[in-house]
């Protein structure tokens, strides 16, 4: 009888799922929100000192600093 009670208590304790914050970890999100060889950042609008280079998904822009922009034409 004692082992049955112990088994039931362990089952109840192990089945408890503690509440957690939903969403991804901020460090993981920062890695996946980068673009262009981890030099750009995916945003809805670029800041003043940044320029838009490519799209990130459907709605976001890949914003790069001007010094990180690749050379498009070589003369």
From Swiss-Prot:
An annotated GO BP: defense response to bacterium
Top-level taxon in the UniProt lineage: Eukaryota
Signal sequence interval, chain numbering: 1-22
Keywords: Antibiotic, Antimicrobial, Defensin, Disulfide bond, Secreted, Signal
Subcellular localization(s) per the UniProt record: Secreted
Main location: secreted
Disulfide-bond pairs as recorded: 35-62, 42-56, 46-63
GO cellular component entries: extracellular region
Pfam hit, one: Defensin_beta_2
Alphabetical list of InterPro entries matching this protein: Beta-defensin, Beta_defensin_dom
Function, as annotated: Has antibacterial activity.
Protein family according to the UniProt entry: Belongs to the beta-defensin family.
Name this protein carries in UniProt: Beta-defensin 30
């Amino acid at each position: 009888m004692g082992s049955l009670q112990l088994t039931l208590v362990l089952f109840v304790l192990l089945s408890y799922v503690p509440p957690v914050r939903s969403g991804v970890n901020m460090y993981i999100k920062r890695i996946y929100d980068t673009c262009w060889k981890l030099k750009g950042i995916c945003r809805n609008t670029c800041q003043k000192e940044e320029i838009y280079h490519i799209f990130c998904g459907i709605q976001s822009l890949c914003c790069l600093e001007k010094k990180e922009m690749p050379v498009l034409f070589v003369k």
